[in-house]
């Protein structure tokens, strides 16, 4: 009996939330008109691509026992900065480089504040969230910045093998960061840092440097997501991605990544992202009013945290 119980726990840990997604997807396919259409499937994948891209590195932040609230602001600001630089220089490469550079810089600042200065991740990233959002408004004068380089739009509006390019970018991120978290020393050290910071330090893991690298990566990937979003919208918009950070964290935790650190797999992230995307897509097709969708988003976040607490109790953490 005990072996059966252990076997179920192992199965649930590895694929439980993916099974939940499969059931949810099947139910929606039979009960929601137009859900399983090709156009809607493409729209569903496109709608979760930004969350999926950023969640890949949020996984590392959470696994290390921290989180980053500035990612939504970085997405907006990176798109604006890319648009401004592109328009002034006439170079798509310079624009993309500027957006990525901004994301990496914000991530580095977050990492230094948290790892070196010892400031709590909540306070540090909440501060940079406000600063970066404000900077985006200043650079854009509070308005959308139209992009004049048509070649830039290929990044967000083209397709390959039947899938939109942003979805391919998301899939590549899933593969690369999934390999990093599960197959490399960097990933193992990240999980060790989140599981027991003091033990990780005593084991010789350079914890401060590791945290700095993790947050720098998070900033860079958020910058990439902002550039892709600007390409999709054909403009840099300082108002986009408000609340995106909570969606990303909720997706990770709903999939099984622990808020307290030390636990995380890419399969968890994929499951959480797909579940959130499916629920929202179904609500849109059912014409659920936006006000009620806000309530549903809050309930999803609360459910995610509840799952995390139950897992902690079950594991004795």
Each model region followed by its residue ranges:
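Transmembrane helix-bundle core of multi-pass membrane transporters
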Residues: 117, 121-184, 210-213, 232-241, ...
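Short loop segments and helix-boundary regions at transmembrane helix junctions
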Residues: 2-8, 67, 104-145, 183-185, ...
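Transmembrane alpha-helical segments in multi-pass inner-membrane proteins
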Residues: 216, 222, 232-297
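Inter-helical junctions in multi-pass inner-membrane proteins, predominant
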Residues: 33-43, 136-142, 180-187, 214-251, ...
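Hydrophobic alpha-helical segments embedded in the membrane of multi-pass proteins
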Residues: 48-57, 73-77, 104-108, 171, ...
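Single transmembrane alpha-helix segments in multi-pass membrane proteins
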Residues: 23-88, 112-119, 256-266, 299
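Helix-loop-helix "hairpin" substructures at the membrane interface of multi-pass membrane proteins
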Residues: 91-99, 105-110, 114, 161-236
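Cytosolic-side transmembrane-helix boundaries in multi-pass membrane proteins
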Residues: 1-26, 30, 202-209, 281-317
């Amino acid at each position: 009996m005990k072996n059966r119980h252990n076997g179920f726990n192992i199965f649930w840990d590895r694929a439980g939330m993916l099974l939940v997604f499969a059931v949810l997807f099947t139910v929606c396919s039979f009960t929601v008109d137009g859900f399983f259409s090709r156009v809607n499937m493409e729209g569903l994948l496109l709608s979760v691509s930004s969350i999926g891209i950023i969640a890949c590195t949020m996984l590392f932040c959470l696994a290390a026992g921290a989180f980053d609230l500035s990612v939504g602001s970085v997405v907006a600001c990176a798109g604006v900065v890319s648009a401004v630089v592109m328009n002034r220089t006439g170079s798509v490469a310079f624009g993309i480089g500027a957006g990525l550079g901004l994301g990496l810089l914000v991530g580095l600042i977050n990492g230094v504040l948290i790892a070196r200065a010892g400031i709590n991740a909540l306070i540090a990233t909440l501060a940079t969230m406000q600063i970066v959002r404000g900077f985006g408004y200043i650079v854009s004068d509070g308005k959308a910045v139209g992009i004049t380089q048509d070649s830039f739009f290929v990044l967000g509006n083209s397709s390959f093998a039947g899938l939109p390019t942003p979805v391919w970018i998301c899939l590549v991120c899933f593969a690369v960061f999934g390999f990093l978290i599960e197959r490399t020393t960097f990933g193992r050290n990240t999980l060790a840092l989140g599981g027991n910071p003091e033990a990780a330090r005593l084991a010789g893991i350079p914890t401060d440097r590791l945290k700095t690298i993790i947050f720098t990566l998070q900033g860079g990937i958020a910058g990439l997501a902002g550039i892709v979003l600007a390409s999709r919208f054909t403009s840099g918009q300082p108002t986009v991605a408000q609340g995106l950070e909570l969606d990303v964290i909720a997706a990770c935790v709903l999939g099984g990544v622990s808020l307290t650190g030390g636990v995380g797999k890419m399969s968890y992230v994929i499951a959480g992202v797909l579940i959130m995307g499916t629920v929202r897509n179904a609500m849109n097709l059912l014409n659920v009013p936006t006000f009620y969708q806000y309530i549903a988003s809050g309930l999803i976040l609360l459910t995610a945290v509840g799952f995390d607490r139950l897992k902690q109790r079950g594991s004795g953490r």
